[in-house]
Amino acid sequence: VPVECFYARFGAFGNFQWMRALTEEWGGDLSNLITQRGLNYERGQRTERRLALKENELSKALGAAVISDVALIGLDLYMQEGPAIGLLFEARNNFLLSQSINQQRQEAQRAAPGAKLEDVEIRGGKASLLSTPDQTVRSFYVVSGSYHLVTTSRYLAERFLAAPGEKTTLGDSDGFRYARSVMPV
């Protein structure tokens, strides 16, 4: 995780599923849960659509066998405007996770008018970009080892790929290490 990112780690795929179900119960928006209001700005649905990631019956049943951990990372939380966020998956099985993500991206391309799915180069590596002309879908997919990132932001994808080589990951930062010493898991 790049040092400049916020980071909400779920610890296990089951915890991620629980949080998704809870936020859906409150209108798909974590802020509704916190403020206990029933307003529905469809932020969760828009972000899901923008990333081209959906939870389906197969992922509910087999997700924990394919994914060991999930984190929400990003640079901002401007949910109304379109945040620079991403879902970071740690794979138990790289092949099955990449197959699932790529299948969802192909389905999203077919479903969205004018959607374009293309390979792009980011920091000398291969990435996948799925986008529509109006940016209702804008999704970069990059892989580094057993980590798979689906993000709305090219910059976030670049930083994700660069961070390990630069030793500037969030986990290496003094602030993060201090916070973990004060509030261990």
Predicted features, each with a name:
Residues V1-K126:
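Structural boundary/hinge residues at secondary-structure and domain interfaces
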